């Protein structure tokens, strides 16, 4: 609530959203550049097994949703908001207030591909290029990624999304898209 921004990103087991075996594994959040936190949800790691009892993970998610996503005073930021918003809606969390989608901001400025987060990190934050390849993270299937590595990756995603979205938003304002 202090910064007024929340960059969010779900990681899942890569199953289709409306299949019975779909699981959101973590939700990562960045409130300020250079930081991040991950909320474990339905990850298989034994250290968070207690979250599955009585759907404690869902209570955590809904609490976050109420305090952040449904708070109209916090600007929500994502790279491909459609994906994250579908996850929130699945669990009856409905955003209020401003949303900045970094992918759409990039597209408005230049519709030519690539439009992906990793490509934009490589272009605008080159010191972090290839972060998804750290410890061969990208070679592990989504439903088997270790919790600690997944959280590190998710926090980098939300951190870089926040940095890039704010950078791209300034460009949109300077080009007269809005004020």
Regions found by a protein language model. Give the residues of each.
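N-terminal accessory regions of nucleic-acid-interacting proteins
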Residues: 1-10, 14, 20, 24
